């Protein structure tokens, strides 16, 4: 379906001229994002087919230049903005329980190592995750993805790492795979088996690293 949104307060562009490949704008250069004011945007079946300012649109129409077939639906974008989708490349969107109490400890000066030594941190998250079913984890994660989407995120990476065992890491990755089926976001997964070392793992850090890399990883890919 051909659609057009008109009178946008702002249309943020990835690059000018738009024919160039998007580049990276680091640091203060991020203040120089090109923006079209009082703009329009055309799209059809999820693909952008045209954009520009309303004055450009009026000029083209008055001069008889065709912009393709007329839109089947015109939306009023007064006061609204259109931005390129955000890519959130580092998230832990799948988890079983928040750790806000640890945040209070950090504010009071506790180090992460001190929190972990008392049973908190990643090990606390791993225990909570092991106790929940995949269905529960999916049901709890979907609203988080919906909240991200409402604020402009269109692609998201989700890490495992709160499993710390083959079964739980596999469970987390299965949850991410299920989220891909139910969310319109572009969802990618990362195996983070070395997020922390379980205190009860026989052989300690060296043995855990060996297991996570050489035994678990081949069974998860």
Model-predicted segments: where are they?
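Metal-associated gating/positioning segment near the N- to mid-region
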Residues: 65-140
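Intrinsically disordered, low-complexity coil segments
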Residues: 21-23, 58-75, 202-203, 209-210
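Divalent metal-coordination and catalytic microenvironments
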Residues: 41, 46, 79, 90, ...
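Conserved beta-strand scaffold positions in the cores of enzyme catalytic domains, especially
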Residues: 5-7, 13, 72-76, 189
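N-terminal metal-binding scaffold of metallo-dependent hydrolase/deaminase domains
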Residues: 1-65
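Metal-coordinating catalytic core of metallo-dependent amide/deamination hydrolases
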Residues: 125-140, 146, 154-221
């Amino acid at each position: 379906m051909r659609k057009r949104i008109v009178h946008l307060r702002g249309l943020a562009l990835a690059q000018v001229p738009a024919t160039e490949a998007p580049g990276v704008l680091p640091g203060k250069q991020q203040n120089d994002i090109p923006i079209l004011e009082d703009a329009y945007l055309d799209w059809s079946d999820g693909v952008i087919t045209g954009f520009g300012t309303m004055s450009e649109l009026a000029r083209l129409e008055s001069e008889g230049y065709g912009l393709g077939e007329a839109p089947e639906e015109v939306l009023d974008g007064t006061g609204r903005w259109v931005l390129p989708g955000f890519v959130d490349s580092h998230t832990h969107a799948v988890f079983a329980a928040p750790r806000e109490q640890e945040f209070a400890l950090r504010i009071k000066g506790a180090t992460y190592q001190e929190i972990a030594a008392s049973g908190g941190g990643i090990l606390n998250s791993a225990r909570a995750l092991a106790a929940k079913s995949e269905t529960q984890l999916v049901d709890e994660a979907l609203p988080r993805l919906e909240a991200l989407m409402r604020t402009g995120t269109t692609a998201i990476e989700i890490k495992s790492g709160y499993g710390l065992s083959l079964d739980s890491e596999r469970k987390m990755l299965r949850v991410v795979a299920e989220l891909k089926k139910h969310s319109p976001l572009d969802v990618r997964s990362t195996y983070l088996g070395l997020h922390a070392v379980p205190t009860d793992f026989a052989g300690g850090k060296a043995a855990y690293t060996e297991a996570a890399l050489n035994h678990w990883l081949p069974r998860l890919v």
